[in-house]
Amino acid sequence: MDPLISAASVIAAGLAVGLASIGPGVGQGTAAGQAVEGIARQPEAEGKIRGTLLLSLAFMEALTIYGLVVALALLFANPFV
């Protein structure tokens, strides 16, 4: 295996995980903050808000998992070799 390809794959894997985590991290923080604010304003809607929050957090976390899958593919099943 060419050392340049190996080094580029490791760097790309790190960038894939890092960049794939930024957006969902910001989104999850914003969503949780807005959910807490919504529950504070309207406590009787707490169950509905919490259910919607958990579903949306799962969808956001899926984006990070996709980045991890790409990184693992670059590290262990390198298509450039």
Swiss-Prot record:
Subcellular localization, as worded in the UniProt entry: Plastid, Chloroplast thylakoid membrane
Remaining remarks: In plastids the F-type ATPase is also known as CF(1)CF(0).
Gene Ontology cellular-component annotations: chloroplast thylakoid membrane; proton-transporting ATP synthase complex; proton-transporting two-sector ATPase complex, proton-transporting domain
HAMAP family: ATP_synth_c_bact
Residues flagged as site, Reversibly protonated during proton transport: 61
Transmembrane segments: 3-23, 57-77
Name this protein carries in UniProt: ATP synthase subunit c, chloroplastic
Cell membrane as UniProt keyword: no
Subunit structure, interactors included: F-type ATPases have 2 components, F(1) - the catalytic core - and F(0) - the membrane proton channel. F(1) has five subunits: alpha(3), beta(3), gamma(1), delta(1), epsilon(1). F(0) has four main subunits: a(1), b(1), b'(1) and c(10-14). The alpha and beta chains form an alternating ring which encloses part of the gamma chain. F(1) is attached to F(0) by a central stalk formed by the gamma and epsilon chains, while a peripheral stalk is formed by the delta, b and b' chains.
Annotated family: Belongs to the ATPase C chain family.
InterPro entries according to UniProt: ATP_synth_csu_bac/chlpt (IPR005953), ATP_synth_F0_csu (IPR000454), ATP_synth_F0_csu_DDCD_BS (IPR020537), ATP_synth_F0_csu_sf (IPR038662), ATPase_proteolipid_c-like_dom (IPR002379), F/V-ATP_Csub_sf (IPR035921)
Gene name of this polypeptide: atpH
Pfam families: ATP-synt_C
Keyword Ion transport tagged: yes
NCBIfam families in alphabetical order: ATP_synt_c, PRK07354.1
UniProt function note: F(1)F(0) ATP synthase produces ATP from ADP in the presence of a proton or sodium gradient. F-type ATPases consist of two structural domains, F(1) containing the extramembraneous catalytic core and F(0) containing the membrane proton channel, linked together by a central stalk and a peripheral stalk. During catalysis, ATP synthesis in the catalytic domain of F(1) is coupled via a rotary mechanism of the central stalk subunits to proton translocation.
UniProt superkingdom: Eukaryota
Provenance organism: Ipomoea purpurea
Record keywords, A-Z: ATP synthesis, CF(0), Chloroplast, Hydrogen ion transport, Ion transport, Lipid-binding, Membrane, Plastid, Thylakoid, Transmembrane, Transmembrane helix, Transport
Gene Ontology molecular function, alphabetical: lipid binding; proton-transporting ATP synthase activity, rotational mechanism
Membrane topology of the entry: Multi-pass membrane protein
